[in-house]
Design a protein with these regions (language model features):
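C-terminal helical cap(s) of enzyme catalytic domains, especially alpha/beta-barrels
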Residues: 203-226
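Conserved anion-binding
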Residues: 18, 86-173
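Catalytic cores of alpha/beta
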Residues: 22-23, 74-82, 120-131, 178-196
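Glycine-rich, proline-tolerant flexible connector loops at the mouths of alpha/beta enzymes
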Residues: 33-48, 141-149, 204-206
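N-terminal active-site wall of soluble small-molecule enzyme domains
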Residues: 34-105
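Structural motif
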Residues: 28-29, 59, 83, 109, ...
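Hydrophobic faces of well-ordered beta-strands that scaffold small-molecule active sites
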Residues: 6-11, 33-35, 56, 64-68, ...
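Conserved, mostly hydrophobic/aromatic
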Residues: 19, 36, 80, 136, ...
């Protein structure tokens, strides 16, 4: 059976004046709901918060992934678990020194544990706790800064991670995140990514009407992979 490339739209990009309709469409058609949580400290921009997840918790059936681009994620694990996150994904450099404690806490809260690596972070950083993870997010641009070009060296990082997963018999998703567009679907798929995060360039900017934008995105994804 041919492997599918899963999609995770970044929900903070939804149009406030068309929010309910867009959420319903995304919930029906997506594999994950990607929630970018940014504090203006770890990254220079701001994102959505736990209230956003809590508002959707009983309205959606698709798993919500809280991508914590925040300096002190340990302080907010319980908050995001209660808000309805199925996955909680902090960054490696924000849990350094307490990685096992953080990952085990996420699991104790009933969530699946992810980890995110910026492009300059080597895979060796997560070697010892990789068996505990349910998802690894490979940032293909530096986190939290818009308008970047995809760093193509990250394709090799994904290939290496796929090899490690196979050799060790592990079971975690590999997600690619950052400046997603049709030109990188095939390279990421061929490298072994299981899922891609969709932002404005890949989805919302495709058309003024969201349903039309979604159809364009689907056609681009299909044409690039076939």
């Amino acid at each position: 059976m041919e492997r599918k490339l899963m999609i995770a739209p970044s929900m903070g990009c939804c149009d406030l004046f068309d929010m309910e309709r867009q959420v319903r469409i995304i919930d029906e058609k997506s594999d994950f709901l990607h929630m970018d949580i940014k504090d203006g400290v770890y990254v220079p921009s701001f994102g959505i918060g736990p209230e956003f997840l809590a508002a959707l918790k009983d309205k959606v059936s698709t798993p919500m992934d809280a991508h914590l681009m925040i300096k002190h994620p340990q302080q907010y694990l319980e908050t995001f678990a209660k808000a309805g996150a199925a996955y909680i994904t902090p960054h490696t450099d924000c849990i350094e020194g307490a990685a096992f404690v953080t990952i085990n806490k996420i699991k104790e809260l009933g969530c699946k544990a992810g980890i995110a690596l910026n492009p300059s972070v080597p895979l060796e950083t997560i070697e010892y706790y990789l068996p505990l993870l349910d998802k690894v997010t490979i940032m293909i641009v530096d986190a939290g800064i818009s308008g970047q070009k995809v760093i193509e060296q990250t394709y090799d990082k994904i290939r290496k991670l796929v090899k490690i997963r196979e050799e060790k018999g592990l079971d975690f998703l590999i997600e690619a995140d950052g400046s997603m567009n049709r030109d990188v679907y095939r390279p990421l798929y061929e490298a072994g990514a299981d899922m891609v995060v969709l932002g404005p360039p890949a989805l919302w900017n495709k058309a003024d009407d969201f349903e039309e934008a979604w159809a364009i995105m689907e056609n681009e994804l299909e044409s690039e992979l076939n």
